[in-house]
Curated annotation (Swiss-Prot):
Subunit of the heterotrimeric GatCAB amidotransferase (AdT) complex, composed of A, B and C subunits. PANTHER family: GLUTAMYL-TRNA(GLN) AMIDOTRANSFERASE SUBUNIT C, MITOCHONDRIAL. It is an enzyme of class 6 (ligase). It catalyses: L-glutamyl-tRNA(Gln) + L-glutamine + ATP + H2O = L-glutaminyl-tRNA(Gln) + L-glutamate + ADP + phosphate + H(+). GO terms for cellular component: glutamyl-tRNA(Gln) amidotransferase complex; mitochondrion. It comes from Culex quinquefasciatus. This is Glutamyl-tRNA(Gln) amidotransferase subunit C-2, mitochondrial.
Length: 166
């Protein structure tokens, strides 16, 4: 019975069953060539042409080039449209202004602008040209409140008109 099954599978119905063995198997090897043709990659030696540094850059900002601590007065609080009701909130705002002012001391000479963090992908910027015509009035009709052809955004937690505190 086994003999007849082998004859059935070796028949012309399955011509791919009798494919020729690869050359390295014909030589009596067990399934793999003696030496691999693939090379190992040393991942530490890979260098990519990238604007993004391979290691984090921690610039040292000296205390002389950064501005001194800017005091937050009532006018600054009013412009922020956020009511600072405690001394801790005042300190937090002063700390944020001091932290943000460090950007003034960063030297950006010779640094190309980065349009996208995915610099290996192609970024096609469209031309800046008007394509829809003059639709300013149509857009402004969607606004709840407008002032001199501008949208009026809702204020923060402080009213725009304030009575002076006594």
């Amino acid at each position: 019975m086994i003999q007849s099954c082998r004859k059935l599978f070796r028949s012309d119905r399955c011509p791919n069953l009798h494919r020729k063995k690869p050359a390295y198997l014909e030589a009596g090897q067990r399934g793999f060539p003696e030496k691999s043709t693939r090379q190992k990659i040393n991942y530490h030696e890979l260098k990519h042409l990238s604007k993004v540094p391979q290691r984090p850059h921690k610039p040292t900002i000296d205390g002389q080039s950064t501005p001194t601590r800017i005091p937050v007065d009532a006018q600054t609080v009013r412009l922020s449209l956020v009511d600072l009701d405690s001394a801790e909130a005042h300190r937090t705002l002063e700390d944020a202004i001091e932290f943000a002012s460090q950007i003034l001391s960063v030297d950006t000479d010779g640094v190309e602008p980065l349009y996208t963090v995915l610099e290996r992908d192609r970024l096609t910027l469209r031309e800046d040209r008007v394509s829809d015509g003059n639709i300013q009035q149509d857009v402004l009709r969607n606004a709840r409140v407008t002032e001199e052809e501008y949208f009026v955004a809702p204020p923060g937690n402080i009213p725009l008109e304030q009575e002076p505190k006594k």
